[in-house]
Amino acid sequence: MPLSYQHFRKLLLLDDEAGPLEEELPRLADEGLNRRVAEDLNLGNLNVSIPWTHKVGNFTGLYSSTVPVFNSEWQTPSFPDIHLQEDIINRCQQFVGPLNVNEKRRLKLVMPARFFPNLTKYLPLDKGIKPYYPEHIVNHYFKTRHYLHTLWKAGILYKRETTRSASFCGSPYSWEQELQHGRLFFKTSKRHGDESFCSQSSGILARPSVGPCFRSQFKQSRLGLQPQQGPLARGLAGRSGSIRARVHPTTRQSFGVEPSGSGHIDNSASNSSSCLHQSAVRKAAYSHLSTSKRQSSSGHAVEFHNISSSSARSQSKGPILSCWWLQFRNSKPCSDYCLSHIVNLLEDWGPCTENGEHNIRIPRTPARVTGGVFLVDKNPHNTAESRLVVDFSQFSRGSTRVSWPKFAVPNLQSLTNLLSSNLSWLSLDVSAAFYHIPLHPAAMPHLLVGSSGLPRYVARLSSNSRNINNKHGTMQDLHDSCSRHLYVSLLLLYKTFGRKLHLYSHPIILGFRKIPMGVGLSPFLLAQFTSAICSVVRRAFPHCLAFSYMDDVVLGAKSVQHLESFFTSVTNFLLSLGIHLNPHKTKRWGYSLNFMGYVIGSWGTLPQEHIVLKIKKCFRKLPVNRPIDWKVCQRIVGLLGFAAPFTQCGYPALLPLYACIQAKQAFTFSPTYKAFLCKQYLNLYPVARQRSGLCQVFADATPTGWGLAMGHQRMRGTFVAPLPIHTAELLAACFARSRSGAKLIGTDNSVVLSRKYTSFPWLLGCAANWILRGTSFVYVPSALNPADDPSRGRLGLYRPLLRLPFRPTTGRTSLYAVSPSVPSHLPVRVHFASPLHVAWRPP
């Protein structure tokens, strides 16, 4: 006869009419009983022959992926001009006095952030924009390209101009070495003479493949080759130019550059238009005139003709340089859907590329990408705006994967101890938080995104994708890409983007200037950054509380008026550091704070309402006696696990589900087990904050017996059969709690101390979780434990009773100053003088 739910509850001692605990509880540790119950509840039967269920409510498992929806009306979000102040440490010190080591170290980590993976795999430009929406290829291409352009304009991306230089918009940082007209320009240095400056820049931009003698003159650095100063280096740089110039003296003409008399381009500043320009020209000459093998590897992806204005003017001089888009102007329409109809709509399509406000030197960056991008809805509640997803998962895979740094996430109890109080709360919204943190330019070659330009993208993805030859010159090839679909799409997009269609149809390679979201390093850096800032704020306002997790920042104060003035001061401080807040999204919570999916008030912590509703919906849809795919079980456990600490039996109740996921087998819910879980999650109990106090109740056990010391009282007992030591210690702790009712118990067992009961026999874990709910444990060494003697059967010997103080833990999140108490009545002026210099103790 299967086990009924009532009987199962009684078995777990969840009902009041259970017998004496000392007899009932040890029975639950019996392996035989655990096995029989598991069989009765059909928990152990993992091998099933019926087909698995792959969908429960919204949860899907193997073989079914949610089809993303493309929205042709997506708006690209606007990004403020985010520029985090470089002297952020000095500004913080002016605000709060000297920073402690922790804060300094964290702020230095992000100014600038560095990222050097072991190995970077470069992908062809065609893979830059993922064909995520096959029905909307062209539309998705332009929307993504527009998003990337917006990020570049906002100073979040670099644009690769040549192998060794990039341009960007916005304010430069000191570690970005600026090139002015192709020369390296250091703000700090006095310029000694044009000649040496120019030779230096030509060294930077010259290709390192000239030969060993050339390379040896330059010292290799993280940012590429840097010449050693001196006449030899200077002469060599000049000669390297001349070696190149003689290779193809005839080709120079077609590139719109007048060579000097001898056919030798001199490298001094007086008679060259710009070193940057020459190197671009050189590169173009090389890339088009070397062997076909070189051609195929370059992916014809980057058009070099538009690096400077002079070469852009010479568009009509040769077929190599002409722009795909503008070529349609001179061609006969091939059909009613020929792109030439669109190109002839406008006289002036604008430039082929846009130049940034600043040019900087970068390490050698290939014309490739390292990750693909695509667009999705900004979030489930906001489908009007798009969000860019960047796939840099290559850095988390394979043998060369980067092991990302770990960082402290506050656990539920720490969070409750810290934030459960009678304060008034508000939360700040940092806009585009990740894009605040600058990346060193040396990381650029590893974080590249971009696109190969419209013609290649469309040709590669269209059904009749012909091999793209190198005969761009012939009109037939030009019209290969004309199609009704492309024509209609472009006509609609013309309304949105206008002449930008031309700009966006060109290839582009962009590197990240601020940390991207798709790299495991970013959450770590953001967490370090916001926690350091909050630590500074707490020190400046010791009678208030500021706390952050990633980009979620909350402020708390004793009264609403106090909170408002605190909010104003903090906002001004954050703005002075260059942190952008979103004023429309500031939320005032009153006395119960919504944070990290929890509601935290003076009574403790509970999960937020939307999570409770999700759980109820999940149970409504949960099928009984049908095997459920383990991948779906993973999703279910993820949801139930979040709310498990608020239930009677906690995580141990979910152990059968964990076991099936580990075995990668289907799980079948029996009616009793489902009813048990359902009841567990219908009544949620708040997790309360721990109070500090003195521990006066101690428990200890041996495999055969247990002992308690409560004040001056001693108790002991024996087990029917010897038990594993951890199980015995857990039982002793349960007896101590039920006998004394004390919320503080001293134990010498680390497993009991951890309050994780998932490694014990299943039934015992569930029962112990309910008995010990809300109990805090203090570690007492065995030698000092007053319950040690009774557990060994000796009641006569008294060890002195310890006075063990208990301090509630706030985990590693407690970077927080000791606050003086605040008077309950409000003074005339809220006094912000900090007693910190006296009271602050480093954590």
Curated annotation (Swiss-Prot):
GO molecular function: DNA binding; DNA-directed DNA polymerase activity; metal ion binding; RNA-directed DNA polymerase activity; RNA-DNA hybrid ribonuclease activity
Positions of Mg(2+) binding: 429, 551-552
Family classification: Belongs to the hepadnaviridae P protein family.
Annotated protein name in UniProt: Protein P
InterPro entries: DNA/RNA_pol_sf (IPR043502), DNApol_viral_C (IPR001462), DNApol_viral_N (IPR000201), HBV_DPOL (IPR037531), Rev_trsase/Diguanyl_cyclase (IPR043128), RT_dom (IPR000477), Viral_Replic_Matur_Polypro (IPR051320)
HAMAP family reported for this sequence: HBV_DPOL (MF_04073)
UniProt keywords, alphabetically: DNA replication, DNA-binding, DNA-directed DNA polymerase, Endonuclease, Host-virus interaction, Hydrolase, Inhibition of host innate immune response by virus, Inhibition of host RLR pathway by virus, Magnesium, Metal-binding, Multifunctional enzyme, Nuclease, Nucleotidyltransferase, RNA-directed DNA polymerase, Transferase, Viral immunoevasion
Listed GO biological process terms: DNA replication; symbiont-mediated suppression of host innate immune response
Catalytic reaction annotation: DNA(n) + a 2'-deoxyribonucleoside 5'-triphosphate = DNA(n+1) + diphosphate; Endonucleolytic cleavage to 5'-phosphomonoester
Known role: Multifunctional enzyme that converts the viral RNA genome into dsDNA in viral cytoplasmic capsids. This enzyme displays a DNA polymerase activity that can copy either DNA or RNA templates, and a ribonuclease H (RNase H) activity that cleaves the RNA strand of RNA-DNA heteroduplexes in a partially processive 3'- to 5'-endonucleasic mode. Neo-synthesized pregenomic RNA (pgRNA) are encapsidated together with the P protein, and reverse-transcribed inside the nucleocapsid.
Tagged with keyword Endoplasmic reticulum: no
Region annotated Terminal protein domain (TP), chain positions: 1-177
Listed PROSITE patterns: RT_POL (PS50878)
Enzyme Commission number: 2.7.7.7, 2.7.7.49, 3.1.26.4
Domain Reverse transcriptase: 357-600
Activity regulation, free text: Activated by host HSP70 and HSP40 in vitro to be able to bind the epsilon loop of the pgRNA. Because deletion of the RNase H region renders the protein partly chaperone-independent, the chaperones may be needed indirectly to relieve occlusion of the RNA-binding site by this domain. Inhibited by several reverse-transcriptase inhibitors: Lamivudine, Adefovir and Entecavir.
Region (Polymerase/reverse transcriptase domain (RT)): 347-690
Disulphide bridges: none
Record-marked site positions (Priming of reverse-transcription by covalently linking the first nucleotide of the (-)DNA): 63
Domain notes: Terminal protein domain (TP) is hepadnavirus-specific. Spacer domain is highly variable and separates the TP and RT domains. Polymerase/reverse-transcriptase domain (RT) and ribonuclease H domain (RH) are similar to retrovirus reverse transcriptase/RNase H. The polymerase/reverse transcriptase (RT) and ribonuclease H (RH) domains are structured in five subdomains: finger, palm, thumb, connection and RNase H. Within the palm subdomain, the 'primer grip' region is thought to be involved in the positioning of the primer terminus for accommodating the incoming nucleotide. The RH domain stabilizes the association of RT with primer-template.
Region annotation Disordered: where it falls in the sequence: 248-272
Alphabetical list of PANTHER family matching this protein: PEPTIDASE A2 DOMAIN-CONTAINING PROTEIN-RELATED, POL PROTEIN
Region annotation Spacer: where it falls in the sequence: 178-346
Miscellaneous information on this protein: Hepadnaviral virions contain probably just one P protein molecule per particle.
